[in-house]
Regions:
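Strongly charged
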Residues: 1-104
Length: 104
């Protein structure tokens, strides 16, 4: 079984906890993700209190190597990336994780 939480699982969990129709929950979850994606695409940070912050940052131009031709240097242009900073409550919850189970 995968260790990933999918959008479908989020929809089903909300449906089970609230009893709202799955189509409405699916639409609401998708709308939320669309709003977050649009804000990030505009260069805005997204702050979700007690969870974390999605920050748009610029990754500088750098020199990389082609794995097929290690002698050839490749210029990797600067680009925008999204970085996640966990909030205080999430950090506390992560400290309680069983790291041995996580690595298995």
């Amino acid at each position: 079984m995968s260790n990933n939480l999918t959008k479908r699982e989020i929809v089903l969990t909300i449906y089970e906890k609230t009893g709202f129709p799955q189509k409405e929950v699916q639409a609401t979850v998708q709308m939320t993700l669309d709003i977050i994606q649009k804000a990030l695409a505009e260069g805005r940070n997204v702050e979700l209190r007690n969870f974390g912050v999605l920050e748009v940052q610029v990754r500088k131009q750098r020199i990389g190597r082609n794995p097929n031709k290690p002698e050839a240097e490749v210029i990797i242009p600067q680009r925008a990336v999204v970085k996640f900073k966990s909030g205080k409550i999430l950090k506390q919850q992560l400290k309680k994780l069983d790291l041995v189970k996580l690595q298995a």
